[in-house]
Curated annotation (Swiss-Prot):
Source taxonomy: Eukaryota, Metazoa, Chordata, Craniata, Vertebrata
Annotated function: Has bacteriolytic activity against M.luteus.
Extent of the signal sequence: 1-19
Keyword Hydrolase: yes
Residues the record marks as active site: E92, D105
Name the record gives this protein: Lysozyme g
UniProt subcellular location: Secreted
Provenance organism: Struthio camelus
CDD domains recorded: GEWL
SUPFAM superfamilies: Lysozyme-like
Amino acid sequence: MHLMLVLLGLAALLGTSQSRTGCYGDVNRVDTTGASCKSAKPEKLNYCGVAASRKIAERDLQSMDRYKALIKKVGQKLCVDPAVIAGIISRESHAGKALRNGWGDNGNGFGLMQVDRRSHKPVGEWNGERHLMQGTEILISMIKAIQKKFPRWTKEQQLKGGISAYNAGPGNVRSYERMDIGTTHDDYANDVVARAQYYKQHGY
């Protein structure tokens, strides 16, 4: 009896730890076409698509790993898949490599997740927990806006729509098939999802 209770408790604990980052869907179940050639070309790649996204994510992995524990901590706190946070960080700042003193986008984007100071007041250090919390909370607000706008979409479709909205706002997401039209290089969610799937395979 005691052993049964211990096993049940362990099963509940494992279930909780899994669900603690899966509130907004499973990124591995999201379809993606990966990076457009417009995103691949500046990275000096002569191919596009999922392979290009994965190659860029691979190049960023060493820098990303410096923040792995922090990304996972924030993901658990906010119930967001850490791989999705990592995918956004790779796309936005190459895990910090593209920033000058923590800033990018001509001085408008702050931190690893490039919080736009024209829309939000950046908080914390550019590579710290408060910044990652803020960026991830912005992502959650976008996912929730898409959930409200498209209630019949699956969780995974809403997750992808929220990622697209993180770049161009929920108003830009007009249909599932064309959600990335109007995002940077017209591929934002597809590229981020493909990178996130790579990071998922590398312990995020």
